[in-house]
Structure formats: C-alpha cells, structure tokens
C-alpha cells in the first residue's frame, strides 16, 4: 500500500512541478482503482503535454465520469470543456460541440467561476474564427476579461486579451491590436500564466504579427516562445513553436534548418491540431519550392490539402515555375474566390499579380495590385506600412510598370522593394527584387547598373540554394546556355487566304487561330516566346511536351468549321536568352527549329530526328527524310508525326 501511495505522490508532485514526463510515467505505473477523478484529470494533462492525445482523452473521460458520479458538477464541467477543446483541435466538431453543450448545462445555476469564463472565451473564439462576427467577438472577449478580473484569474484575463487583440487587428485596428498582444505576451514572458495559456498567447501574437507583415515583431516573439518551449518539459506546443521558428528561418534564408523544423513540427502536431498541421505541411512545400525541389513541394502541398488547407498561393507559383500558366492562374483565382477576409486575400494577391502577368492578363494583374495596396494601407502601423508589406506592394506595382514600359518608375519600385526587404532581413526576397530591378534597368538602357543587380541576385540565390532562380539570373547575365525544345507554327498561304476572305473575316479567323494555338502551348506547359507574323515561336522544357502541344494544335484546328492550314516544326538544342528583358531566345538551336518549320507542309508536324530519339511520344512517326535547310551545310534528318 505504501508503494502505491509513494507512486501516487510522485505522480502528483511531478504534475505540480510541470515535470510532465515523470508524472505520466508515474501515473501509468498505477492501478486505475487507485486514482481519484482529480488524478485522472492530472493524468490526462500529463499525457497531453507529452504528446499522447488519445491517452489524454481517455484519462479525461475517466475524470469526467468520476466527477459526474461524485456529483461534482464544476469538476465535470471543467473536464468537459477541456475535452471540447481536444476534439476541436482534431476537427471532430460534432463531438466538440457535444462536450461544450454538456459543460454549459452543468454550469447552470453554479456560482461564477473560471469555467464560466472558459465558456465565454470559447464563444468568443467561435464568433471570431467560425462566424466571422468581429463585433460579437470583441463583446465576448471583453466580458471574459471582466469576469477574469472579478474572480482574480490572470490566465482568463490574458487569454481574452489576446483574443481581443487578434479581433481588433482583423477589424483593421492594427496598432491597438498589436499593443494588446505585446501586453499579453509580456505576461507570458514573466511566467504569470499556466503552460497552456502561455503557449496559446504566444501563438496568437506571432500569427497576428505575420498577418500584418510585422516580421520584426514576429521574430522577437518567436524567439521568446522558443525559449519557453526549449525550457518546458512538454510536447504539442513545441510543435507550434517549431513551426513559427521554421517560418522565421525560411525568411532569414536558412532553408535546410527551416525544413527540418517544419517537418518535426508536423510530426508533433498531427495528433493535436489538424489546422496547424496542415499549415506545417504547407510551410514545408514553400521551403522546397524555393529550393527547386518541385517533386517534394508537390508532395507537401498535397499533404497540406489532405489535412484541410488549400495550398495556395504556393501551388500556383509551383505551377508557374513548371510553365503551367493557365493552371497557376486558375488555382490562385479559385482560392481567392473562396475567401473574403482581407488578411487571407492579402496572402494570395501578390502571387496573382505575378501569374496574371505571365498569362498576359494585365487587367487582372492591375486589379490585384490595386486591391493589394488598399489592404496593405488598411494595416498601417504608426501611419506607415510595415517594411514587408511595403516591399510586396512595390514589387506588384513594379511588375505593372515594367509591362507598361514605364521603366523609370519600375526601377524605382523595385529599388524600394529591395531596400525594404533588406530592412526585414529577408535575403531571398531581396535577391528577387534585385533581379527584377536588373530587368528594369536593362530595359531602361542601364546595362552596367543591371549587371550589378543581377550579379548581386545571383550570389544570393547561390548562397541560399535557390537552384532555378540561380539559373534564371545566370541566363539574364548571358553566362549559360539553356537546352529547350523550340517550336515554330505558321499559317500556310496566309496572303492568299486574306485575299479570299477579306479583312474582317480574316481578322476573326486569325483571332480564333491565335486563341487556339496559344492555349494549347500553355496547356502543355510551354512558353509563348513571341508572335512571328501569323504564327508562334514557343519553347518547352522537353520534347514530349512539345509533341503534345503540336498535336493538340492540329487537332483543335481540325475541329473548327473553318480554320487555316498550319505547319509546325521543332528542334531541341542549346540557346541563349536575348532581348532587352531576356524574354527571347537566340542561337543555332532556334535557327534550326525555324528552318524545320519552314520545310513542313500544310497540316504537317515536323521534328528533327535527334529531338525525338528516346522521347517516347506515343504517336506514329514517318520514316526519316533528309532535308537541305537554308543556312546549314549538311542535310538534317527529320520525321513527320501522324497526329490524326
């Protein structure tokens, strides 16, 4: 008997010291018959803080049953509220609501207590997060604060203060909201709060700082939260701490460490909170996308989606990097259609500007940039934009100005973005702004200035391990050639067709032709380099994609009632970027593709034989034939693709 008492005292004392692992081990060694309802409640807490949610729920259910059997309504209500929060985190909303309703019923007629405050706090969080009723949320948070003062419970006061701060920020009162967050977090730093309250206060503060672009404040509170997590004998909240740490590490440019932290966070959080776990997988995708690990990023975004987070705008930017512009635009546009809260729209609008520009839709890009600027201006602190938000606005504005050939204004916008990102301490974003500034300076005719910016961007990308961005910078500096499959399309006998149809019918026919050809190029992951008279010059990452596009073009035209005859030629070879904005290609590979296109007949798809070696297109090919092409000393072997 004395051994049982000793083990029980050990478990209780360890819980009182917040030595949760020791407490859990001691409770686990005891027979269940030796435990009181209060012991089961402590056992559940120990299980929760050591990352064992299922066991925590089991012990808390036993505690609830014990309190209920003893007629202790307050104890039963307390545990019911905790179980409600447990199930809310794992997205078991019906079960959560059931436990919450049970707690409310049990508290009826009882003297005012902390549990009454927890009910009001839960109602306030529901109004904020689920209903989006901000005035109602503020009223309820204020009620919880006052109740906390009356009963002398500091945790209730500070938790409600944090919730009110987050609500004020979402209402547009950023300065007051951040001030309240700082006040609440100071209480957490000073050790005034219990562990659960401490972790929750830190999380709400850091999330709000990210939402308003105050990266400096987010980094400071993240560091404070990490110190607490590292010192505490807990799991669960450390996963959230790791995730915030990963976000800051990514921003600071330490991507390998950031990915390790984010992956570890997902492992720690998966049994606790589906929403935050989904955010963790999304963060993993963001890190991998920047490093050029597209397969890994795709996998992480897919997992985030499975856990309940729409993986935008990251997935859209991944599709853009893959050359799938239409898919990128559709994904980001759909994601924006699903949200109306400014803070959520703010996250996707910069990407929409970039993708819309790539799709050639200046109208959509301009509208997104205007909305972005309006939202950012509603989140000013001290009458000024935060550096991160100011940088985002100027990048979007610079893209619009660059497209409109306002090169001086574009250079000013990108320079401002570079300076602001430097203030934030974000090397990747700084390098990206420098690359765009280099493009603007080149278009303005300042090649020396452009080279300085592009050199700086390249050095940063290489340090960070941003593979694709490094290649892009090298291309712009003319240091590397790129290997692509180049495709040329051309309308056969266009002059004769114009004479037959007349100007108006020809204009409509040409517009329809352009729509079909451009669309099939983009759908197959190609890049429309430029229009060439009444045809197109396009590039593809690989021959298979080029074949798919060429076949799709011919079939689409064949389905039209009236359509021109088009010939298509292609070749894979080395080339280099040309043009003031490096949007064009030059070199022998391009020249040969153009000559093969000119050698094709009406309705024919003609590829160089070398291009299709091992490509596995799945289409029947003609026997090779040798073509003597202008500008080439030796005949070139070509094959025709049977697309019908």
Which residue ranges define each predicted feature?
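Amphipathic alpha-helical regulatory segments at dimerization interfaces
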Residues: 29, 358, 463, 476-479, ...
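Helix-coil-helix junctions within alpha-helical repeat/solenoid scaffolds
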Residues: 2-7, 11-24, 28, 37-40, ...
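Catalytic NTP-binding/metal-coordinating core of nucleotidyl cyclase/transferase enzymes
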Residues: 478-551, 556
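Hydrophobic or amphipathic alpha-helical targeting/insertion segments
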Residues: 75-87, 91-102, 116
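Catalytic beta-strand-to-alpha-helix segment of the class III nucleotidyl cyclase homology domain
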Residues: 537-644
């Amino acid at each position: 008997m004395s051994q049982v008492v000793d083990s029980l005292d050990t478990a209780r004392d360890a819980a009182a010291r917040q030595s949760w692992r020791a407490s859990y081990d001691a409770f686990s060694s005891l027979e269940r018959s030796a435990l009181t309802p209060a012991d089961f409640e402590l056992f559940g807490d120990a299980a929760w803080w050591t990352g064992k949610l299922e066991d925590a729920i089991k012990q808390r259910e036993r505690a609830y049953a014990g309190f209920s059997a003893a007629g202790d309504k307050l104890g039963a209500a307390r545990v019911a509220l905790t179980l409600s929060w447990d199930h809310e985190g794992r997205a078991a909303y019906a079960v959560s609501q059931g436990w919450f309703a049970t707690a409310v019923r049990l508290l009826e007629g009882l003297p005012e207590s902390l549990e009454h405050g927890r009910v009001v706090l839960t109602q306030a969080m529901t109004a904020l997060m689920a209903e989006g009723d901000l005035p109602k949320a503020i009223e309820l948070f204020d009620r919880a604060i006052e109740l906390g003062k009356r009963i002398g419970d500091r945790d209730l006061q500070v938790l409600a203060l944090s919730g009110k701060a987050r609500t004020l920020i979402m209402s547009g009162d950023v300065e007051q909201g951040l001030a309240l967050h700082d006040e609440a977090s100071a209480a957490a730093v000073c050790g005034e709060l219990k562990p659960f309250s401490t972790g929750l206060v830190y999380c709400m503060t850091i999330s709000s700082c990210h939402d308003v672009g105050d990266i400096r404040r987010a980094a400071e509170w993240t560091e404070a939260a990490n110190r607490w997590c590292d010192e505490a004998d807990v799991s669960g909240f450390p996963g959230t701490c790791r995730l915030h740490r990963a976000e800051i590490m990514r921003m600071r440019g330490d991507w390998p460490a950031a990915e390790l932290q984010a992956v570890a966070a997902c492992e720690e959080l998966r049994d606790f909170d589906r929403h935050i776990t989904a955010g963790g997988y999304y963060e993993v995708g963001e890190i991998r996308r920047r490093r050029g690990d597209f397969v890994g990023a795709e996998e992480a975004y897919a997992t985030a989606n499975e856990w309940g987070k729409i993986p935008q705008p990251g997935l859209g930017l991944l599709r853009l990097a893959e050359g799938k512009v239409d898919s990128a635009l559709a994904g980001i546009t759909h994601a924006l259609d699903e949200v109306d809260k400014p803070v959520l729209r703010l996250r996707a609008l910069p990407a929409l500007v970039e993708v819309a520009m790539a799709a050639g839709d200046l109208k959509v890009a301009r509208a997104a940039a205007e909305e972005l600027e309006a939202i950012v201006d509603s989140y000013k602190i001290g009458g000024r934009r935060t550096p991160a938000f100011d940088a985002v606005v100027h990048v979007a504005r610079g893209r619009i100005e660059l497209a409109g050939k306002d090169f001086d204004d574009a250079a000013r916008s990108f320079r401002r973005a570079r300076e602001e990102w430097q203030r934030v301490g974000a090397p990747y974003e700084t390098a990206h702004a420098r690359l765009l500034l280099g493009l603007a300076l080149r278009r303005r005719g300042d090649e020396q200035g452009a080279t300085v910016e592009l050199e700086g961007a390249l050095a940063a990308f290489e340090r960070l391990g941003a593979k694709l961005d490094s290649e892009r910078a090298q291309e712009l500096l003319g240091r590397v050639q790129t290997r692509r499959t180049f495709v040329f399309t051309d309308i056969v006998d266009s002059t004769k067709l114009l004479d037959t149809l007349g100007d108006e019918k020809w204009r409509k026919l040409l517009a329809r032709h352009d729509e079909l050809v451009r669309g099939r190029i983009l759908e197959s992951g190609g890049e429309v380099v430029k229009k060439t008279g009444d045809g197109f010059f396009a590039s593809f990452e690989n021959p298979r994609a080029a074949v798919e596009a060429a076949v799709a073009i011919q079939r689409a035209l064949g389905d039209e009632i009236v359509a021109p005859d088009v010939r298509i030629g292609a070749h894979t070879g080395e080339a280099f970027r040309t043009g003031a904005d490096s949007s064009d290609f030059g070199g022998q590979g391009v020249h040969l593709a153009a000559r093969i296109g000119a050698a094709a007949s009406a309705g024919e798809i003609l590829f160089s034989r070398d291009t299709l070696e091992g490509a596995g297109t799945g289409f029947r090919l003609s026997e090779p034939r040798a073509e003597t092409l202008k500008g080439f000393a030796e005949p070139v072997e070509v094959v025709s693709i049977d697309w019908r």
